[in-house]
Structures are given as C-alpha cells and as structure tokens.
UniProtKB/Swiss-Prot annotation:
Family as reported in the entry's similarity comment: Belongs to the EOS1 family.
Main localization of the protein described in the UniProt heading: endoplasmic reticulum
One Pfam match: EOS1
Protein name: N-glycosylation protein eos1
PANTHER family in the record: N-GLYCOSYLATION PROTEIN EOS1 (PTHR28147:SF1)
Places the protein is found: Endoplasmic reticulum membrane
Function noted in UniProt: Involved in N-glycosylation.
Amino acid sequence: MKQYLNTVISNPRPAQALGINQPFVVFCFITSRALSFVPAIYWCFKCLHLAFVADKFKWLPLTSALWTLVSAYLSFVLANGFLLKWLIHYSIGPTIIRLFSLNVINFSFLSLSVSFITHGDNAYLLPAWIAISCFQTAAYIVQDWITSPIIRTLPFRSSSSSSSNYRHNLDFLEITVFAVVPVGIASFFTMVMLIWQLYKYPDSFLVSA
C-alpha cells in the first residue's frame, strides 16, 4: 500500500526519466494524476452510503463500490500512460493542459455514462460501473499498443534506434497485471455476492422484478 501511495504522490517515472524535476511542474503532474480518480472515488463513497442506508439488497451498492475502485485505478493508469506519450511529443506546458483536459473528459464520461445507464435508478449502478470499467480496460489496451514504441525507446530518446523499436505491439503481461487482474478480481467478488444473494434470498429477484 505504501508503494502505491508513493506512486501517486511522487514525480511520475516518465518525468524522472526525462530529467523533469521542477517543483511546480511536479506538483501539476501529481495533481492532474490524482484528479483522474476523484470522480470514481466520489461514486464509491456514494455507493457505500447507499449500502449503509439500504434495508436489503446491500450487495448491489457494495459491489458497485468495488467496481468504482476498479474504474478509479484504470483512470489513473490511463492518465499515467497519456502523460508518457505527451511528454515525448509535447513540451511541459501543453502536456499539463492536456492532462487537466483529460480529467474534464473523464469526469464528463463517467457522469454521462452513469446517467445514461441508470436513468436515475440506483439499482442499475452495478451494470453501469461494470460497463465503464470494461470500456476503460479496452481503452488501456489500445493505449498500451500505441505507447509501446515510446516505452522501448524512452531511455534513448536522443540516440538513433532501429525501425523495429518503433513497431507497435502488445505487452500481454502488462495488460494482464494492470488491466485484466483488477477486473477479474472485481468480477469474482461480484459473482460471490450474487451467489450469496441467491442462496440467502432465493425469491429476491422474482420479487424485485
């Protein structure tokens, strides 16, 4: 946990590799990356509040809160990946502007997705956040493919490299660790909660229908 916390509040590794260590710039990078998961964390607390005040079907807001955490994590790794690409292609100022613009887009995407899928009914928060997390997982896979040449050539930015260094490929190990595993863990616990609900209240879904 301490390692992940240090990752959030420390200078991003791409900036360190490029020798960017100005305090104000580092503060902007840290702030923009932290803002990436604020919307999902807000919905996490909202789901936990719904679980606290609910008389039954507490598993729905609880599992929804779990998926919001998955979305928050994916939002962070997406912002970190865009930071890597933009630092290579743009100067510091445009990169910071793009990062904050990305947070605005992320906030709008999450808000509109939840509103469109749930139509104001909190009972649909779980499928909404599952859909959001799956979309973000697909976006991370595309981003990993796009930034794959940058990752290989980053330490040798000023040197000439062979054309093979600029070929796009997918790092399946990285995708599995950073995208598939979080979604898989959340899916497992969602399935367990659903089975528990069916076992304890076998007629609950018939009644709710």
